[in-house]
Amino acid sequence: MSSLDKTMHFDFNQNKGKNVYDTLQDVYNALEEKGYNPINQIVGYLLSGDPAYIPRHNDARNLILKHERDEIIEELVKSYLGKNK
């Protein structure tokens, strides 16, 4: 059987890289280093979807764009409610 006849398995989560928590920590630190209010900037990004709220400093913008906004919000709600399962 050739490799073209085999079904490949793709695991989306395996290729994600950093988890949401680590990404938010890095973005928060980058915003602080640039003198911004990190909470306001992250909330602005999550509400608007405009990546201009996140600086390119320390690759923060590219890091946060690797996650969907709804995924970030879901993780924040789970964390807030203590439902990190």
UniProtKB/Swiss-Prot annotation:
Entry-linked InterPro entries: IreB (IPR009309)
PANTHER family according to UniProt: UPF0297 PROTEIN YRZL
Species of provenance: Lactobacillus acidophilus (strain ATCC 700396 / NCK56 / N2 / NCFM)
NCBIfam families tied to this protein: PRK05473.1
A Pfam entry, by short name: IreB
Chain segments annotated as coiled-coil in the UniProt record: none
Name of the protein in its database record: UPF0297 protein LBA0418
Family statement: Belongs to the UPF0297 family.
